Amino acid sequence: MARTVQCVLLKKEADGLDFSPYPGELGKRIYEQVSKEAWQQWLKHQTMLVNENRLNLADARARQYLARQMERYFFGEGADQPTGYVPPTA
C-alpha cells in the first residue's frame, strides 16, 4: 500500500514520496507534507528557473537560491517566476 500524505501544495490526500528528496529539516518537511504529484510540479518549475536564469548548479549561490525557492514554493508565498514568463492557457 502506498504511503499517503496531506499535501501542503495540492491541499488534498495524495501518494507520498518514497524517500526524502532533500537533506536536513527541509527534506524531512517535504517528505512528510508533499505528494509525488506536487514534487513533479516543483521539478518542472525548478528546471524552468535553472534554464531561464541560466543558473550554474556548481555555484553554491545558485544551489542556495534553488533551496530558498523550493521552500517558498511549498511552504511560503510561492517561488519566483522567470522575468517575462506567461503561463500557457488551457
Swiss-Prot record:
InterPro entries: Fe_traffick_prot_YggX, Fe_traffick_prot_YggX_sf. Signal peptide: none annotated. The keyword Amino-acid biosynthesis does not apply. It comes from the Bacteria. One of its GO terms (molecular function) is iron ion binding. Coiled coil: none annotated. Transmembrane segments: none annotated. One of its GO terms (biological process) is cellular response to oxidative stress. Keywords: Iron. NCBIfam families: PRK05408.1 (NF003817). Belongs to the Fe(2+)-trafficking protein family. This is Probable Fe(2+)-trafficking protein.
